[in-house]
Amino acid sequence: CARTLLDWAKEHGARYAELNYGGNDWRRHFWESVGFIENGADEWGEPLMLLPPEEDAPITVELLADPDDWQLKKLENGFLKEIGEAPSTEEKQEQLAQAIRDGKITFFVAKRGYRAVGMCSISRCFSTFACTDVGIFDDFYIEPAFRKKGAAWLLAQAAQEWSKENALASLTVTCAPCDEGMYQALGFDTHLGNTFAYLR
């Protein structure tokens, strides 16, 4: 029945087959047997599965145009789920949207056709060391089904070019030791010591 439905959807032009499995292990195992893989979360934080598309399609990167875009909320929750954090609340989503409107943070979105499959962000702050604005690179996330297809490189390049065009003195990223090699390969190749934080 599932195969028949998927074949019908494909015949009628569906580009993606995605579902919310509710975190139920039995459902997850069933859909995995059909070919689906776990793929982030929806805008409410519920876990999703996606049938990876068979056809190749180009991935492009663009600046986020709509601070209230539901696809950004979806990517943010996928990012939070992957790093073991709770889904974003409606209040936090509105705070983020307002920060985007105010120009405090800029998002870049990787798209495969109309679907947003990845993101990253730059937050601006003033540095007394540089006596000008610097940028912090964050929210770097690509949906599992679309990794190893060049989206990471495209996002990093777009962010680095934007930081140059907007006269940011530097663009820095804080990461876990296991991710150092990845960020160095993406052009973040200057080591600036360690980061320590006071968390309220």
Regions found by a protein language model. Name each.
Residues V109, R115-R124, I136, Y141:
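Conserved beta-strand in the GNAT
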Residues W70, K74-A97:
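Conserved GNAT-fold acetyl-CoA-binding loop/helix
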Residues E32-A41, Q184-N194:
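Conserved acetyl-CoA-binding loop of GNAT-fold acetyltransferases
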Residues A97-V109, I136:
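A short helix-loop-beta-strand connector motif used in the catalytic cores of GNAT acetyltransferases and
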Residues E18-R28, L171-M182, F196-R200:
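Conserved beta-strand-loop-alpha-helix junction that forms the acyl-donor binding cleft
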Residues G40, I59-K74:
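A short beta-loop-alpha structural element at the N-terminal edge
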